[in-house]
């Protein structure tokens, strides 16, 4: 597994890579994501990416979620 220190979005990670949620770029989307357990400070791991890149399966807070690429692009990681 690889971890990143530079800020990047969740949509940029490949399967097996992980990061820590830092912030969100879309206020409306951030509410939805936080309700699903994707909170700042939480570790997020990409488990799978569909062949065309959409959706992206992630593990966060002990749950597996599927996000659209747009949704994943609103999550900034550290």
Please describe what each predicted stretch is.
Residues 1-78:
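Compact, glycine-rich, soluble single-domain proteins
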């Amino acid at each position: 597994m690889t971890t990143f220190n530079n800020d990047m979005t969740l949509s940029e990670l490949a399967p097996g890579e992980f990061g820590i949620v830092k912030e969100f770029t879309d206020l409306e989307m951030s509410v939805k994501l936080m309700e699903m357990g994707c909170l700042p400070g939480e570790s997020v791991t990409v488990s799978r990416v569909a062949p065309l890149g959409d959706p992206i399966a992630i593990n966060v807070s002990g749950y597996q979620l599927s996000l659209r690429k747009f949704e994943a692009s609103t999550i900034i990681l550290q």
